[in-house]
Amino acid sequence: MSHPHRTLIASRRAFLAGTGMTALTALTLAACGANSRSSSGASASAKAGGNLTILTSATDVGWDPAKSQSMPMTSLGLVHRRLTTWKLAPGKPVELAPDLATDTGKASDDGRTWTFTLKKGLKFSDGSAITSAHIKHGVERSFAPALSGGLGYHKSLLAGAEGYQGPYSGAHLSSIETPDESTIVFHLARAFGDWPWIVAQPAFSPVPEGDDPATYSHAPIASGPYQIDQYKQGSSITLKRNPHWSKDTDSIRLALPDTFTFSLGQDETTSAQRLIADSGEDRNAFGADRVSAAQLAQVSANESAKSRLATSPEGGPLAFLAINVQRVSDVNVRKAIAHAVDKAAVVAALGGELGAQAASTYITPGIPGRQSYDLYPHDAAKAKELLTGKTVPALVLLTDNGAASKAMAEAVGQSLKEAGLTVTIEPVEPDTFTERASKGDGSTYDLAIANWNPDYPSANANIQPLFASSEIGSGGSNYARYSNAEVDAAIAQAQANLDAKAAQAQWAALDRKIAEEVPVVPLAYRRNSFLHGSGVAGFFVESYPAYPSYQVIGVSAS
């Protein structure tokens, strides 16, 4: 499981078990205490050149795309390009953009076949040409058991991929065709309108054949503007320019710094203090870890630091309470639980308005097509009314033992107690949480605190993982163990829709339909805050993906 609050990988799995801010306090902070976006704004004040340092608590950064869960705009995107990518700009929603491909794909066969053409003049860092065969090899190697752990949407979508074990034994996928060096064709098992977003994921980075899966993570062949220069285990990683990358083929990556230095294993509190002090080389640095609630209070009291804090305008990842519908089968009891929860108390537990916003929908802010509604506002009297005459056994509330998760669990438990319910909170190690909520049979818990960050900006990435019956057990994230054949069918219909606007309407309707059965209570949208030095420009955070884009950050011209 990835670290809960660093941007090096920035994936939904960073929030799967509900881990959250370190050094958490119940301190309530006012949203006006810091800028909603960094004062750096866009990259107009940045210049080419210099070194940009990234302070991170991570002790390593993996550069093998097959094993990565990263979003396109973070560290992996500096070294590896994909067929498509994300375009981010201050104050604007994320857009899909061509990367190695000339466009975002052409669908045929009613959405079951997708064709991409590569741009001309693409080269690896060793000077060799990038071809469609390298994209195919990159995708195929993601199926190898030795390279597990990366995003795997494509594995269930490509036709004939079931049981495939990768290319290293000589086997290849017939569902990926490369009729020439610049064309790649994907044949899917079913129509999937979000496929252009899927090919922006790490597995669709080109990898030359002959790679060594055991060492590629630390010695990759780059297709992006940077390549690894120095790798010091547990200490630092330095990136230098890839001389064979051409900005003429890449409209997304500004590639401003001459070098990037990843300073590994840094204590988060110490890093924040260094950035607040803003002296020496730290002026040209930023933190990959989210600023904790306690440190947000300190930043808010420091005008200089406050001007260098970037916070997602609206909340990002969803913190939620899953109700195990197999054990809490009475929908009115579930509605009572939803009305009983005081979300303001949950927000306070996460650090106040700078740390979170109260949630009411499953689709998170910044996702296209999201429609706001609130079926279950806090109403203790309504909760008690719904529970009248019912005998509800003591409820087991499962949570991981992270500070934020426990704080949310305490807030939820107190709310339910005030409604007349008996709740036992069980904090466990993250791996134990996964075993019980994700891999077990659901018999050991009634409620579970968790978080979810969608892998890409489509409501499918909010809804399907949490509510499809296929995601119950076996490592899935349907912690509510919710199974509804009509919902499964509606998910499949929305996924197959090639009309993005029409699909968005389907997802919004499905969001509300599921909420009527209350398998999950949305608690809060987590707001992410990141701090940077005064010499850093182009640093901003939007509601989605709620992380800074490494592709446009540079050193200021001052």
Task: Place the predicted regions along the sequence by residue.
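Periplasmic binding protein-like
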Residues: 54, 127, 275, 279-281, ...
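Gly/Pro-rich hinge or "lid" segments in bacterial periplasmic/extracellular proteins
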Residues: 88-89, 171, 182, 187-254, ...
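Aromatic- and charge-enriched surface segment that lines or borders ligand/interaction sites
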Residues: 103-154, 185, 277, 329
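Extracellular/periplasmic solute-recognition and catalytic clefts
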Residues: 149, 229-240, 261-325
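Long beta-strand-rich cores associated with HINT superfamily self-processing modules
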Residues: 530-558
